A protein has these predicted regions:
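Canonical Radical SAM [4Fe-4S] cluster-binding loop centered on the CxxxCxxC motif
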Residues: 2-8, 13-61
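Conserved short hydrophobic patches within well-ordered secondary structure
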Residues: 30, 80, 93-96, 127
Length: 142
């Protein structure tokens, strides 16, 4: 099988978030280190694991203003929200999604990585209403 232009063997279209990431156009938002799970394979460092800290591209941030600044510095076309579990801090997650969409417009692609543990229909509706474009679930393997 032949590799594609993304150095992968997948010959279908990659999700938009993946396309931006490969091109270096996606800001990574580490929303919190808090997570309801204790997966044996969790890659978080001791500085982040189960700690309520926020980073944008490994830059510590404490405000929405700093989030926007980091996105502008890298000319981001989108953002991926990860953690811990971003749904452990749902209000913050919703605030950051709406802030980015309001500042950059609806074309700014936002996806989130989360677990099924905190995912409910009302939570999904709030994420959709805030402007989330894509969601990726980590399976329960522990």
């Amino acid at each position: 099988m032949e590799e594609n232009k993304f150095y992968s063997y997948n010959h279908k279209d990659l999700p938009k978030g993946c396309q931006y990431c490969i091109k270096g156009q996606k800001m990574v938002i580490f929303l919190t280190g808090i997570c309801p799970r204790k997966c044996y394979f969790c890659p978080l460092s001791d500085d982040k694991f189960q700690k309520d800290v926020i980073f944008a591209n490994e830059r510590p941030i404490i405000s929405s203003k700093e989030l926007i600044e980091e996105a502008e510095l890298m000319d981001a076309k989108g953002a991926g929200i990860t953690g811990g579990d971003p749904l452990a801090k749902l209000d913050r997650t919703l605030r950051y999604i709406t802030t980015l969409k309001k500042h950059f417009g609806s074309h700014f692609h936002i996806h989130i990585y989360t677990t099924l543990r905190l995912t409910t229909e009302p939570v999904l509706q709030k994420l959709y209403k805030a402007g989330l474009d894509e969601i990726r679930f980590h399976p329960d393997l522990d």
